[in-house]
Amino acid sequence: MIKVSHETPLCLLGDSENFNDYDYCLPHLLDEEEGYLEYFRQAKAKGRYIIMDNSLHELGEAYDSARLMHWINELVPNEFVVPDVWENRDASVVNARKWAQIILPKGVTKVAVVQAQTIHEAATCYQTYRDLGYEKIAFSYG
């Protein structure tokens, strides 16, 4: 079954449960917008499925690792997208290797995102993630 979620402006977050199958959390906004943080605290309390990204697209680089860990430990999302580097296989693999060793709260699934500039890089990035033990692997839109 296909599930849909839209990144939702703060003013519509309260209504988003009516049109989103799950919640997609951008961690940098948890530090910037009190209303955003409160929405995700309530979503967690209601048992909503939460995927926490690393804010690469929004910031141009993944959010600070210490702040990511803080929010992972506080919200305990269902999934966490480990820090990746836009279209850079090698740097993304380095990050994935590091995060593969980090213990997250029970119930949080780590998701690694394939980043590459060629189909060969994409294939080797994917295989490396598999070899590192990632069970959920996503593909970048780039």
What are these regions (language model features)?
Residues M1-I102:
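Non-catalytic, usually N-terminal nucleic-acid engagement modules in DNA/RNA processing proteins
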Residues I72-G142:
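Eukaryote-skewed repeat-based solenoidal scaffolds used as protein-protein interaction platforms
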